[in-house]
Amino acid sequence: MQFLDQAKIYLRSGAGGPGAVSFRHEKYIEYGGPDGGNGGKGGDIVFEAVPGLNTLIDFRYTQHFRAARGASGAGSNKTGAGAKDLVIHVPVGTQVLSEDKEEILHDFTKVGERIIFLKGGDGGRGNASYKSSTNRAPRQHGPGWPAQEAWVWLRLKLLADVGLVGLPNAGKSTFLKATTNAHPKIGNYPFTTLHPQLGVVRRHGQEFVLADIPGLIEGASEGIGIGDRFLGHIERCRILLHLIDASGEDPIAAWHEVQNELALYGAGLAEKPQLLALNKIDSVDEETCAELSQALEEASGQKVLLLSGATGQGLDPILDQLITMTGRAIEKAQESSAQTEKIWSPI
């Protein structure tokens, strides 16, 4: 499946239908009064977050969305039919931004979340509604209220329990493939992964969503290598699994580089719960592995887990710890949500 995490689209709601100009025509009634009905309401533009979507690729091919106009009114005081709403399905995690990207207009965080983004115009008045004691045969009518239109950006920030971070070629895709049902492209060169990949880890009757974020480089927080878009996906992850390549030139510098980019980007990325693993330990000898592990623990101030995504060594302890950490993170989020609801309860 192709991945697209932002798209610019044009939206236009439906205009209201015009009111009718009509007069009652019946046998033996010489001067039938006005009986023109009102026009129908135009269709709304509606966004709805649905399950099963994790890309905005459909918006690459369809970029203009127009709801239908309301039907015209008719004689015998018949109101025109209202137009159907145009419902646009988006993945959970989608943000709707203004055309200049300066304002977040809505943020979809739950399946089934639905908003009316642009309202359709009301129908115009038929001439029957203009009748008065001084105007028995009005011929004026309302044309219907105009449509609303807007250019907006859709931006997707993936919702995942655990986000894999690290420099390019740190072994993130290999880890994803070894632990989930995902089939990412794997290669022994930097930037093999060009788009975020999702997989589901199932273990001991529990499961969590794992996201492979493309490798970060120095300057990613400023947009170099579109790294700011990749960092945006990390915002929604509850926990980060930071993989360090044991066979890299300077694993300690690699750790500092990624941590620095997380801090520079902001949005609380550097404060997220993090698990640190020294990957590709099968490519170095035991002495080197021990030295690197100790140096990383001193630099980071946290325990370093040893891992080889290729051979499977060290996978089980990491997955067990991630399950524990995601459970705590979910409980904490639920408690926070419950407290917020309690604070704002009108009772």
Curated annotation (Swiss-Prot):
Keywords carried by this UniProt record: Cytoplasm, GTP-binding, Hydrolase, Magnesium, Metal-binding, Nucleotide-binding
Xref: PANTHER family: DEVELOPMENTALLY REGULATED GTP-BINDING PROTEIN-RELATED, MITOCHONDRIAL RIBOSOME-ASSOCIATED GTPASE 2
Record-listed Mg(2+) binding positions: S173, T193
Tagged with keyword Methyltransferase: no
NCBIfam families, sorted: Obg_CgtA, PRK12297.1, PRK12299.1
InterPro entries attached to this UniProt entry: G_OBG, GTP-bd, GTP-bd_Obg/CgtA, GTP1-OBG_CS, GTP1_OBG_dom, GTP1_OBG_dom_sf, OBG_GTPase, P-loop_NTPase
Subunit structure: Monomer.
Family under the similarity heading: Belongs to the TRAFAC class OBG-HflX-like GTPase superfamily. OBG GTPase family.
Tagged with keyword Repeat: no
Alphabetical list of Gene3D superfamilies matching this protein: GTP1/OBG domain, P-loop containing nucleotide triphosphate hydrolases
Protein name (Swiss-Prot/TrEMBL): GTPase Obg
Subcellular location: Cytoplasm
EC numbers: 3.6.5.-
Domain Obg: 1-159
Residues annotated as binding GTP: 166-173, 191-195, 212-215, 279-282, 308-310
Source organism superkingdom: Bacteria
Record-linked Pfam families: GTP1_OBG, MMR_HSR1
Gene, per the UniProt record: obg
GO molecular function terms listed in the Swiss-Prot or TrEMBL record: GTP binding; GTPase activity; magnesium ion binding
OBG-type G domain residues: 160-327
